[in-house]
């Protein structure tokens, strides 16, 4: 018993305990809502490049739980995407639909497809030709965040617009 008490009082044990306690209290950083919020700033990319699209326009939108309805914040991002795609017609796009880990594989694949289709339909309504767009669903197979909390799940409920090079 005395050995345990002497170890507990040693400066090394106290320092180790304090460093573990401080590390356990690390705060979480807020993640960006879309790629345009990555802090790289407007104008950091060559106009018309895929980096320009990702940084200055935003390549992803997010959805509410079990929903494929385009939210108001997503409508703004998609409107900017449509304008950019009309300005640079050499690009075609693939719209990836994603879901969080909750639900069956089949349900999440179907939900991801509905999200990709809703995104495609919105862009088409803003003048992007449908022959320049294709959709694919990854369901819950490609999460960007992995944890058992809504902070992660909400990042995985998304549609990502991927640029394909000219002539594709």
Swiss-Prot record:
Give the lipid-moiety residues, type N-palmitoyl cysteine: 25
Q: What biological-process terms (Gene Ontology) are attached?
A: cell division
- Protein's cellular compartments: Cell outer membrane
Its record classes its membrane topology as: Lipid-anchor
The record, for CDD domains, names: OmpA_C-like (cd07185)
Please state the span of the N-terminal signal peptide per the UniProt entry. Answer: 1-24
What keywords are annotated for this sequence in UniProt? Cell cycle, Cell division, Cell outer membrane, Lipoprotein, Membrane, Palmitate, Signal
Under the heading Pfam families, the entry gives:
OmpA
> In terms of one coarse class, where is the protein primarily found?
membrane
The OmpA-like domain covers: 51-167
Q: Which InterPro entries match?
A: Bact_OuterMem_StrucFunc, OMP_bac, OmpA-like, OMPA-like_CS, OmpA-like_sf, Pal, Pal_lipo_C
Q: Write out the PTM section of this UniProt entry.
A: The N-terminus is blocked.
Which positions form S-S bridges? none
**Cellular component annotations (GO), alphabetically ordered:** cell outer membrane
Q: How does it assemble?
A: The Tol-Pal system is composed of five core proteins: the inner membrane proteins TolA, TolQ and TolR, the periplasmic protein TolB and the outer membrane protein Pal. They form a network linking the inner and outer membranes and the peptidoglycan layer.
Q: What does this protein do?
A: Part of the Tol-Pal system, which plays a role in outer membrane invagination during cell division and is important for maintaining outer membrane integrity.
Cross-referenced HAMAP family: Pal (MF_02204)
Q: Which family does it belong to?
A: Belongs to the Pal lipoprotein family.
The name of this protein is Peptidoglycan-associated lipoprotein
Q: What is the species listed in this Swiss-Prot or TrEMBL entry?
A: Brucella abortus biovar 1 (strain 9-941)
- This protein's gene is called pal
């Amino acid at each position: 018993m005395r050995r345990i008490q002497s170890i507990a009082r040693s400066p090394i044990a106290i320092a180790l305990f304090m460093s573990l306690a401080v590390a356990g209290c690390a705060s979480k950083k807020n993640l960006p809502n879309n790629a345009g919020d990555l802090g790289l700033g407007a104008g950091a990319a060559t106009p018309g490049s895929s980096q320009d699209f990702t940084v200055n326009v935003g390549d992803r939108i997010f959805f509410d739980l079990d929903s494929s309805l385009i939210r108001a914040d997503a409508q703004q991002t998609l409107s900017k995407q449509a304008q950019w795609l009309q300005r640079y017609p050499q690009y075609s796009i693939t719209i990836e639909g994603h879901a969080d880990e909750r639900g069956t594989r089949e349900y999440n694949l179907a939900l991801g497809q509905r999200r990709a289709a809703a995104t495609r339909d919105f862009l088409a309504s803003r003048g992007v030709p449908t022959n320049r767009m294709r959709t694919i669903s990854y369901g819950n197979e490609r999460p960007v965040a992995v944890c058992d909390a809504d902070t992660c799940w909400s990042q995985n409920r998304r549609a990502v617009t991927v640029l394909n090079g000219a002539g594709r």
